[in-house]
């Protein structure tokens, strides 16, 4: 059953009419609360503790019911610090799950897990709210057509295309361009698809969240002059927050995205950075609730928790949520239960390479390591599939020949291999692209390249029609016509120098 957004106030607005309990026990972020007989709150209900601590400071802590213990007690997990709470303090049952603001009012703003703005830009319109716990769309509501989500980024669209309503894993270390790629995707979905984006910062560094916000303002993704014209809503639950907040912040972001899909009927991009921290927070909460740990100390409900989040990310007949999830792999062990459970849900992987970033090729997407279940002839068509396979074969052959080139030099290769290397180097450079959001740093205007143009460009390189052009003509251009124009400019400049 789908729960439709309400148009009343937030879930904690009718506190006066709710039943009251008292804190019986506090263990870190976990509270045991006693209620009168017959007035037990439901699982996932929001509880609010209000009062003053020993030094007179105001306390306002929201918790979520996780277990019914018997003896009229429930166990709840706090969404903020429990400092100053004491046994015997009054607890109010709101009678509903956590509800957060949704709709256009969220764009350009930063929220915490409770849907409260934390950017000092004043209150948010909370007339339309939605509960964070909802069931996934029913089968009959799903859109089962397999269609590609065009991003306008050549390397992604050609070699590891995204599925509309799919889930993509983004792998990459620090400083290889994850943030810039994320911002370009946010920019392109707004311009090409009329869509919006929601960014969920789950358990990552506060500094990174702040840097992302500043860069979004600088690049125009967040419009400071007219905040309603912004293209993204931000929801942060960072590393310093209690595990309850980190476990639920992904659901808060997803709830905002669902409104844009179901009510506004838009295509939505949902970014989750980092999906591993969602699992990690669930593991902490599971231990605090006294559950028996499973493999490698993870929660026994790992697959269920991951599934309940991921199954809500999908295409319906109204719109789509396409999710891009940064995946941290602990100790680079892909068999660890957290990344292994995540992989089961992914439709595509985009792997960023430090080697390509060091060469100055941006976006630094590895053409050989990045994969997609969409790259099949029956989905993308024979022409696209054949072109992508030939690009990969040429790149793979170049990779195999690099050791020989390093030892013996290019002249020792056969004529055929020299030709392969020349074309592979052109392909490598043509996979780079100027980004709209990087204009302020690079000075070169951004380019959106349609899929048909991308395929045509790579076909011309592979066919040998452009063998006479210098490889630097292919670097940081949009479509292939720009590369040929750039080559002609080089020719004119060299003649003038002579």
Curated annotation (Swiss-Prot):
**CDD domains named among the record's database cross-references:** ATP-synt_F1_beta_C (cd18110), ATP-synt_F1_beta_N (cd18115), F1-ATPase_beta_CD (cd01133)
Which top EC class applies here?
Answer: translocase
- Binding of ATP occurs at 172-179
Q: Which reaction does it catalyse?
A: ATP + H2O + 4 H(+)(in) = ADP + phosphate + 5 H(+)(out)
Q: Which SUPFAM superfamilies match?
A: C-terminal domain of alpha and beta subunits of F1 ATP synthase, N-terminal domain of alpha and beta subunits of F1 ATP synthase, P-loop containing nucleoside triphosphate hydrolases
Q: What is its main location?
A: plastid
Q: Which UniProt keywords apply?
A: ATP synthesis, ATP-binding, CF(1), Chloroplast, Hydrogen ion transport, Ion transport, Membrane, Nucleotide-binding, Plastid, Thylakoid, Translocase, Transport
What membrane topology is given? Peripheral membrane protein
Give its localization: Plastid, Chloroplast thylakoid membrane
* Family to which the UniProt record says this protein belongs: Belongs to the ATPase alpha/beta chains family.
Report quaternary structure and partners. F-type ATPases have 2 components, CF(1) - the catalytic core - and CF(0) - the membrane proton channel. CF(1) has five subunits: alpha(3), beta(3), gamma(1), delta(1), epsilon(1). CF(0) has four main subunits: a(1), b(1), b'(1) and c(9-12).
Q: What is this protein called?
A: ATP synthase subunit beta, chloroplastic
């Amino acid at each position: 059953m789908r729960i439709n957004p309400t148009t009343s106030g937030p879930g904690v607005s009718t506190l006066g009419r709710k039943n009251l309990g008292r804190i019986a026990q506090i263990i870190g972020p976990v509270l045991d609360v006693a209620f009168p007989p017959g007035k037990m709150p439901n699982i996932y209900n929001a509880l609010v503790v209000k009062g003053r601590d020993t030094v007179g400071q105001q306390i306002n802590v929201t918790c979520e019911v996780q277990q019914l213990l018997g003896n009229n007690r429930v166990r709840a997990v706090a969404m903020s610090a429990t400092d100053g709470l004491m046994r015997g303090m009054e607890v109010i049952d709101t009678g509903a799950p956590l509800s957060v603001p949704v709709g256009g009012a969220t764009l350009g703003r930063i929220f915490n897990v409770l849907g409260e703005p934390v950017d000092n830009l004043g209150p948010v319109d909370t007339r339309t709210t939605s509960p964070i716990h909802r069931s996934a769309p029913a089968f009959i509501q799903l859109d089962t057509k397999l269609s590609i989500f065009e991003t306008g980024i050549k390397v992604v669209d050609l070699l590891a295309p995204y599925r509309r309503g799919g889930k993509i894993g983004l792998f990459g270390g620090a400083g290889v361009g994850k943030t810039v790629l994320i911002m370009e995707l946010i920019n392109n979905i707004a311009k090409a698809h009329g869509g919006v984006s929601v960014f969920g910062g789950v358990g990552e560094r506060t500094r990174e969240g702040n840097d992302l916000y500043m860069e979004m303002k600088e690049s125009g993704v967040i419009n400071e002059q007219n905040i309603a014209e912004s293209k993204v809503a931000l929801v942060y639950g960072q590393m310093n927050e209690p595990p309850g907040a980190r476990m639920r912040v992904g659901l808060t972001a997803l709830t905002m995205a669902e409104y844009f899909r179901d009510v506004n009927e838009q295509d939505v991009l949902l970014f989750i950075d980092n999906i591993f921290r969602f699992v990690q927070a669930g593991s902490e909460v599971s231990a605090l609730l006294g559950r028996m740990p499973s493999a490698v100390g993870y929660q026994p409900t790992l697959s269920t928790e991951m599934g309940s989040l991921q199954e809500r990310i999908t295409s319906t007949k109204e719109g789509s949520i396409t999710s891009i999830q940064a995946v941290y792999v602990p100790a680079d062990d892909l068999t660890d239960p957290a990344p292994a459970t995540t992989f089961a849900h992914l439709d595509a992987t985009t792997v960023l390479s430090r080697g390509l970033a060091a060469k100055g090729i941006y976006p630094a997407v590895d053409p050989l390591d990045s994969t997609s279940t969409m790259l099949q002839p029956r989905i993308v068509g024979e022409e696209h599939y054949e072109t992508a396979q030939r690009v990969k074969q040429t790149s793979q052959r170049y990779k195999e020949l690099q050791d020989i080139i390093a030892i013996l030099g290019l002249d020792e290769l056969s004529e055929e291999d020299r030709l392969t290397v020349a074309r592979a180097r052109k392909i490598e450079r043509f996979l780079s692209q100027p980004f709209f959001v990087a204009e302020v740093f690079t000075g070169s205007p951004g380019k959106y390249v349609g899929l048909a143009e991308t395929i045509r460009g790579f076909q011309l390189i592979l066919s040998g029609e452009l063998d006479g052009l210098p490889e630097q003509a292919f670097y940081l251009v949009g479509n292939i016509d720009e590369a040929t124009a750039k080559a002609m400019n080089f020719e004119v400049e060299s003649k003038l120098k002579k």
